[in-house]
From Swiss-Prot:
GO cellular component: nucleolus
InterPro entries noted in UniProt: ARM-like (IPR011989), ARM-type_fold (IPR016024), CPL_dom (IPR012959), PUM-HD (IPR033133), PUM3 (IPR040059), Pumilio_RNA-bd_rpt (IPR001313)
Pumilio repeat windows: 313-348, 461-496, 497-534, 535-571
Polar residues biased stretches: 79-88
Region annotated Disordered, chain positions: 63-98, 152-197
Limits of the PUM-HD domain: 245-602
Keywords: Repeat, RNA-binding
Origin: domain of life: Eukaryota
GO terms of biological process kind: regulation of translation
Protein name: Pumilio domain-containing protein 12
SMART domains registered for this protein in UniProt: Pumilio
GO molecular function, one term: mRNA binding
Amino acid sequence: MVKLDDKNKKFKGKKKVKNVLEKKAKGLKLNKVDRKRIVKIEEKAALKSKVDKAVKDELERLKKSSSTSVFDNDGTRDSLCSESSFGSQPAPKKKSKKVLFSGELEHVKVFDKRVQDLQIKPSEASPGRGILRSPLDKKVKKLAKVKTVKVAQEEEEEHSAPPKKKVKVNAEKAVASEPADDENLESVDEQAGGDESHIDIPTLKRKRVAIQVTKSVKEQLLNMPRKERKAFLKELKLKRKPEGARAQKCKELWEKIRMGKTPKAEKDTAVHELYGLVKGHAAKLIYAHDTSRVIECLVATEREGIINNLFNELTPEIVRMSKNVYSKFFVKKMLKNGTKEQRDIIINAFRGHAPTLLRIKHAAEVLEYAYNDFANAHQRYNIITEFYGKEFILFREDNIRSLTEILAEKPEKKVVILKHLDEVIGAVNEKETLRLSILHKLMLDFFDNCDEEKKINLLDSLKDKIPEFIHTPDGAKLAIKLIWFAPVKERKLIVKNFKDLSVKAAMEHYGHRVLLALFDTVDDTVLLNKVIVSELANEMKKLIEDDWGEKVIHYLVHPRDGRGIDKREITFLAEGDSNPHSKKTQKDRYGQLYAGITENLYPYLAANFEELVFEANKSKFVAACLETTSSFDLFDRQVPAEARKSCNQAIVELAKKDFVPMDQEGFHIIEHQSGNFILMAVMRCDAALQEDERLSVALAEGLTSKQLGSWVTCNRGCHVLLKMLQVGGPKVIEKLKASISRKHLDGYNSKGANLLKAQLDGNVKK
C-alpha cells in the first residue's frame, strides 16, 4: 500500500515531462511533432555554439590588438591612451534589438595623443532612426557580439593636415539575424586586419531610406558606393512591391481621367490604356488604398464591357474584398450599380461566410448593405439561418419560416441553435456591429425563444445601449420587449440613457415606438418628465412639424388614440400591459405625463395656429389637443383654462379676416377643409365647458354681425353657424339671430342653409 506522505515512492501513472528533450532522454515514445521540435532545437543549439565560438575568437583577437596599440614606439605606455576606448564613461547598457547610432555616441570617443587638455562631454546629437528590423521570430533571435564600424571626426590643430575620416572598432551586443552572419564576421575581420585602430573609408551622405533591411544587408549597404546602393535599394523595393511601377502608371492615368479639363478624346484613350494596365492584375491592385480607387474610377466610367470584365476577374475575391477597408467599396459599388445577376453572384458568394463576416467591422458593413437593400426575402432567410448552425448552411430550404416555427417542428435543435446565436451575440454586441439590422433580427429571435436566465443576461448586456439599436423594426421591437421584461431598477437606467437623445428617437420611424412603450410601463413619471418629456417640450416646433414626432406628442395627449397611431401598434403596445413590474394605474401615469407637456404645448399652438390650421395632416392633432375628456380616454384630461382661451382667441383672429367665397389666394378658415374640421371639433366640446371657455362664445363676441352674416354664402359656413346655435348660450343665439339675414339666407338652397333655416325657425317658435 502506497502512503501519501512517502515522497520516495514513484507515482505510477502518466509520466509528465517538461519538454521534448527530457521526453527523449527518458526514452518515451516520440510522435512526429516531437521529432520535428527536437530537430529544430538541435539546429538552434548548433547555431548558438557556432556564433559563440566566433564571438569568443574575435574578442580574443581584439584583446591582443588593444594590448599592443597602447604602447609607443619606444615601448613605454602613453598616459593619454591608457584608458579604454570608452574613456571614463560607464559601460553602455544592453540596448534594444533595434540598431541605433545615437545611443552609442554618448560613450564612443576618438582620442588623439596631441590633445593635452581633453574634456569629455555628453553628445547632444539627436537620436537617429534605425532602419534595422529583424524579421525573425523572437524565439529565433540570438545575441551575438560583432564588430560595428563607427565614424568620427578627428580634431586637428591649426597647422595640421586636412581632417580624415577615421573608424573606431568597438565590440557590442547586437542581433544575429540569420546563420549567414558568420560571413559578415569574417568580412569585418578582413577590414580590421590592416590597421587595428583606423580604417579609411569613403565619405557617404546620410539619406533616409524608406525601406527596412536586416543587419547583414545594412552592413553591405554601408560598404557600397552611393550609386550601387541606390540601385540595390530600388531593386529590393521592386522585389517587395512588384506592382509598384504599374501602380504608379495607373495613378497617373487616373489623375488624367478624373480631371475635368481633360478632353473627351484623351479621356477615352486614357481609360482604355488604364484598363490595359489593370487587366489581369486587378486582384493585386484592389487591396491598396490608392489603386483601389483607380479600379473604382473604371467602374464609374459606366462602360459595360470594362465593368463586366473587372467583375468577372474579381469574382473569386468577393469575400476577401469585403473584409478589406479599401476594396469593400468596389463590392458595395457593384451591389448598387451592377446588374441583378451580379448582385446575386455577390450575395451567393457570402454563403457559408455570414457568421465570419459579421464579426469583422468592414465585412459586416458590406453584408448589412446587401442584406438590407438588395437581398430578396429568400436570400435574407438564407443569410439569417446560417447563424443557426452548419446544418442550415449545407441544407437550405425553400420554405421561409421563423425561428419559432423551426423550433416547433424540430424541438431537439433548440439547444444547438440557441447556443450558436448566443455565441454570435456575445462576440459582436460590444462592437459597432450593434447597429446592424442583421444582429437585431438575431437578438430578437434569441430573446423570443430563450429561457429566463438567458433573457436576464441579454438584458444586462444591452440595458445601457438601447438607444443605439432602435432605428430598425427588429431593434425597436427588441427594445420594447426588453423594457417590458426589465425590473424597476433597470428601467430607470434605460430612461437615463435617453438623455439628450429623446428628440432624435422621437423623430425616427421605429425609435418613437420605444418612447411610447416607456410612457406605458415606467412608473417613475418624475424621472420620465425630467429626462424625456422635458426635452420633448423644449423642441415642440421641431417635433410637431415632423410626422413621427407629432405622434409622440399626440400619444402624451391622447394615449392609445387610433387617430394618432396605427391600430396594429396599439395592439402590440397593449401586450405590455400585463408585465409584472408596472404597478401604477394608467390613469395616474398618463395624467402625470400630460401635465409635463401642457406648459409648452398650448402656448405653441396659440402662437402658430395659422400655420397648423391650414395643414391637412395637422388638423386631427390640433383638434385632439383642444378636445375635452370622453369615455374613450384613459385619463381625465383637463386643458388649462388660460391655454384654451388663448387658442380660442387665435381662432377668432383668423375668423376676422374678410370672407371671400372660393378665394383664389387662399381659403378662409370657415371654407378651408382643415380649418372647418377644427372649428367643428372644438365647438362640439363647448357644451361641457364653462361659458367663458367656449369657442362659440368667443366667436360671437369677437366678430361683428356683418362678418357672421357673410358666412351663410357657403355650405360650410352655414354648418358652423348651425353648431354655434346648438351649443352656444342665449347670448350667442341672440347675436346670431341679429346677424343672419333671413331674406339673404332664403336665397341659398345648400344642405347647410336648409338646416340653418330649420334651426332658426325652431328657435323663433321657442
